Structure formats: structure tokens, C-alpha cells
Amino acid sequence: ATHVAAARALLGKKLVGKDLAAGSQKSGEKTPNAPYHCDWARLGLLRSGWSADDAVIAVDYTGDRVELEAWAEGRRLLGGAWKTESRVDGLKIEATEEWEETCWFSDRDVDYLELTQILDNGVRIDRQIMFARRDQFLYLCDHFYGGKEASLEHTWQLPLGPAVLFCGEGETRDALLVDGK
């Protein structure tokens, strides 16, 4: 899986997944923290642990788009390009700069990554990705700033994993990803 290769590259270790979960590392060698962010590689791993069944959210923000993979219990829930389209006062706006990390935070409860991108006409988008490890939920949000009042239309798409169904809440923007088997 892509997130395993990213973990190996970022951590510089051959021990990942089941090896770390089983504690097979050399005695006295500390198991690395499960979540990890590398600014220069523009990669983030938000994860609950090293077991193959633990939840993993891998974020690649190289270039002008974001790739996101989400895994839980060994199953891919989401995976691929996070496609967006934004319109301000009916006019489509495009990115003028690449994504930049503006905040990385990780403690025993959550992993949080915030990315910023500048769009046409000085519009800025802040993308928030938060994984709550204990409660096992993923929060994804885009915030827009433009300096003046305007109408905004913003849509995004994330490819679902095999047999995963998106069940949106009718009155809010909350959703559940459900095993369609």
C-alpha cells in the first residue's frame, strides 16, 4: 500500500506495520511515533498505531493538489486525488501557488494537518485534516478567505474505496463511510 511505502521512506526503517505492532524491533530500540509529518517531502501520516488493522490517513500535498488515502481495519476507505472546484461570484477560480503546510499538531488524542493554498484574486483556502484516534473519526474541512463579501460555490470529490458507500446526513455536512458488502 502507498502509505506503507511512505512510512518506510519517511522513517528510514524497514520495520513497519505488523513488524512494529508485534514488537519485533531490536531490543532497546524505541518504536517510532505512529503519526508523522515531513514538510520537505510534503507528506503526512495520521495514524492510530502500527498494526495492519490500525487506521491510517496518508496525505500527499506535492504540487497544486492533494492526494489522500484513508485505511481502517486493513480496508481502503478513500484513495486518490482530492478534486475541488471553486467559484466566487460565479467565476471559477484556480490555484496560483502550491499547497503549503501551515500547521502540524499531534498528541495522544488527535493528529491535525492544515494546508494553505492561494487562488486567483487573492483568495486563500485553508484545508484542515484532523484524525481523532480514540474516537476513530476523520474531519475534513476547507475554509475560504477573500477579503470581501462574495458568493462562494465549492465542491470536492474523493474517490471511495471498493464496496464503500457514502451516507451523507441530510441536514448537515456530516457523513459516514459504510462497508457496502
Could you tell me what each predicted segment is?
Residues 2-180:
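Catalytic and substrate-binding regions of extracellular carbohydrate-active enzymes
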